[in-house]
Amino acid sequence: MNIVHKLLFTLIITSIQVNAQNINVNNIEIIRDNFGVPHIYTKTDKELGYGLAWVHSEDDFKTIQEAYLAGNSLLSKHIGLRGAPIDFLSQLIRSDEIIDSLYSTIDKRFLEVVDGYAQGINRYAELNSSEVLVPKLFPITVKKMLKYSFLQLFVSSEGDRAVRAIFENDFESLTFQRRNELGSNLFSFSTNR
């Protein structure tokens, strides 16, 4: 039985290595123009994701990390108690459960690009470890990236304001209930025209 476990372990490690190595960084060419704007040339979309992550990391690795820290309930590990409300919010919206339940519905081609992006950030972090804010965040995974996107969607939909109003017992400030009294998107259909 021990030999079977060793063989299985070897196969799993090999498949992980093959999957992780399907980005050939020699296929990625990044050229910055006179204004510093990166132009990324690659053979695959996944390599493009890697290159994009690399240039984003070169430009502002700190902000990228802070975003993913927020989405993964780790911001307070970087900025202390000021990050606790955001960490709480990202747990309150159950990002883990939502991402896990919907992950299989996401287009595989999109996930490949996001995986390339994650690999690019991870490689940048590996080569620039002094810039890493919270080591526990790494390695960045596709699901960690999606959790940040979920938090971002929640906040851009003003869900954070609703949570704040509920905790402050201030239901009058929930203006989104009354904001669209007249409607914003009206469709009218008639068989007479």
PLM region spans:
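Bacterial Sec-dependent N-terminal signal peptides
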Residues: M1-N22
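Substrate-recognition/specificity elements adjacent to catalytic centers across diverse enzyme folds
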Residues: I23-R193
